[in-house]
């Protein structure tokens, strides 16, 4: 079979950058500790200063981790936009098959791994890399895992985005205080596992950024959050999940499923990565890469998959649960398709989806019947937010097809990435090379002659550009990048993508 691809050496400059970021994090942590003993000097400004230093600590740690990871090209867009063809073209060498290495075994990605059918079918990020993916004996399938706070963010995202916020009745202070009082009585003296105060503060920062004006977040006053930072790490998983359940208005089914998923992570020691046998991907109809495998998430199942970590923890997890808690599937390409893989990985994101607008008055009934769909939509949306926060997305191939776009959140998601990587203004963006590539997919349809219409290609293609760029991506007044990417120039890094194997039979 094909010889293993040799990965490039670790970049020394990136390691130096990571170490500098770690020193910044250490200094910020030391500043927080100093504030604890310098109360008389800082007086009322102390809490605000501590929050600022904690924010910088988290940011520096994320930057350090990002510096050690390879650059990434992300393929992103709404569901059903033709991303699969682009991924297939980029992940194979010429006309060869896309072959994936699992230890000593090599498999065909399309035939053996990728879910069948034309529907949007993944609920995790797929990483294609030429770097060695080193598994465990008998467990060559490598996965990056969600964290406990990721689960909380996903569940709350599902509640806050899939239920109409105008129908949300915020919890009363008395209800919140009742929960807090019960948890105070249950709290241990010291933290019980890996959850830290910084983790809880990171939760607060997430909701401040994305859901600042949501009734469920507004109801949790800053004073509650400050107490939760010290209280949650001292609670057992069911209790602290109930505490965080305040974010989804204590909807019972959502809390129950969150406990189930976090408990699975705890059985593995809350790992950053875990490993499975090939059975996790077989048969294809129940592979963990197929989002439909999560359909039994709210039920008990005997279909289990063994999972292990490098630290020696092992557990047999329900297949639906494993599918839910995996963030990323890491696939090592047997052959290098293009030279950019020497320094860059290719990330295939699940397609963004239209969010539901159910009445929050029916939240428990909806969750009991459709927890799979709620968690699915929340996870797909959150994965993008996680990779954005972790500074992983160096470049983006944004795929949009010819029909009207219905996923209203995509323009805002793209704008967040642009602000983070290129800048919020045209003046700021001119200092950076453009790494956003707008790909008009399914261009084959533009060659089809429609009955009764003149063949005016210029008008037809201009209309498509206008519809996609101005009316969709640039509709919001906040999204000025469409009209002025750099001073005096609109965004123009656009490409047409067609499949040359498709012929116009008209």
Residue ranges and their predicted role:
Residues 70-74, 89-113, 129, 162, ...:
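Conserved GTPase G-domain substructure that encodes guanine base recognition and part of the catalytic core
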Residues 82-86:
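Conserved glycine(s) of the Walker
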Residues 93-102, 108-109, 144-148, 341-379:
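Switch II (G3) loop of P-loop NTPases
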Residues 315-335, 367-387, 416-421:
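A Trp-anchored, charged/polar loop motif used as the substrate-binding/catalytic surface
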């Amino acid at each position: 079979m094909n010889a293993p691809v040799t990965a490039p050496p670790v970049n020394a400059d990136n390691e130096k950058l990571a170490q500098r970021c770690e020193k910044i994090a250490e200094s910020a942590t030391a500043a927080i500790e100093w504030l604890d003993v310098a109360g008389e000097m800082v007086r009322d400004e102390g809490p605000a200063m501590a929050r600022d230093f904690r924010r910088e600590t988290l940011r520096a740690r994320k930057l350090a981790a990002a510096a050690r990871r390879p650059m990434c090209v992300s393929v992103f867009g709404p569901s059903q936009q033709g991303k699969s063809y682009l991924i297939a073209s980029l992940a194979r060498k010429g006309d060869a098959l896309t072959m994936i290495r699992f230890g000593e075994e090599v498999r065909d990605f399309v035939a053996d791994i990728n879910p069948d059918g034309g529907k949007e079918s993944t609920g995790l990020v797929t990483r294609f890399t030429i770097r060695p993916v080193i598994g465990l004996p008998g467990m060559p399938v490598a996965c990056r895992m969600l964290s406990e706070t990721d689960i909380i963010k996903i569940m709350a995202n599902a509640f806050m985005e899939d239920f109409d916020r105008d129908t949300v009745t915020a919890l009363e202070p008395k209800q919140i205080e009742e929960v807090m009082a019960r948890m105070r009585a249950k709290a241990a003296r010291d933290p019980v596992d890996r959850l830290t105060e910084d983790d809880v503060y990171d939760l607060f920062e997430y909701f401040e950024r994305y859901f600042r004006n949501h009734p469920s977040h507004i109801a949790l006053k800053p004073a509650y959050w400050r107490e939760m930072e010290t209280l949650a790490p001292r609670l057992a998983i069911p209790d602290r999940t109930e505490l965080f359940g305040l974010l989804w208005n204590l909807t019972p089914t959502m809390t129950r499923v969150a406990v189930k998923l976090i408990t699975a992570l705890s059985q593995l020691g809350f790992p950053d990565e875990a490993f499975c046998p090939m059975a996790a991907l077989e048969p294809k109809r129940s592979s963990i890469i197929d989002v439909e495998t999560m359909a039994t998430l709210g039920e008990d199942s005997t279909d289990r998959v063994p999972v292990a970590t490098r630290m020696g923890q092992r557990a047999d997890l329900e297949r639906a649960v494993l599918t839910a808690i995996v963030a990323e599937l890491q696939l090592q390409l047997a052959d290098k398709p293009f030279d950019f893989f020497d320094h860059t990985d290719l990330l295939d994101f699940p397609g963004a989806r239209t969010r539901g607008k159910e009445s929050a008055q029916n939240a428990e009934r909806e969750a009991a019947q459709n927890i799979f769909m709620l968690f699915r939509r929340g996870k797909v949306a959150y994965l993008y937010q996680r990779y954005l926060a972790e500074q992983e997305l160096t470049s983006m191939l944004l795929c949009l097809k010819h029909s009207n776009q219905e996923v209203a959140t995509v323009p805002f998601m793209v704008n967040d990435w642009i602000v983070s990587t290129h800048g919020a203004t045209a003046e700021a963006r001119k200092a950076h090379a453009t790494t956003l590539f707008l790909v008009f997919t399914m261009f084959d349809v533009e060659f089809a002659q429609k009955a009764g219409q003149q063949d005016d290609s210029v008008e037809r293609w201009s209309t498509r550009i206008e519809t996609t760029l101005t009316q969709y991506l640039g509709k919001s007044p906040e999204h000025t990048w469409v009209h002025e990417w750099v001073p005096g120039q609109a965004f123009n890094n656009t490409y047409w993508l067609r499949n040359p194997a498709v012929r116009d039979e008209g």
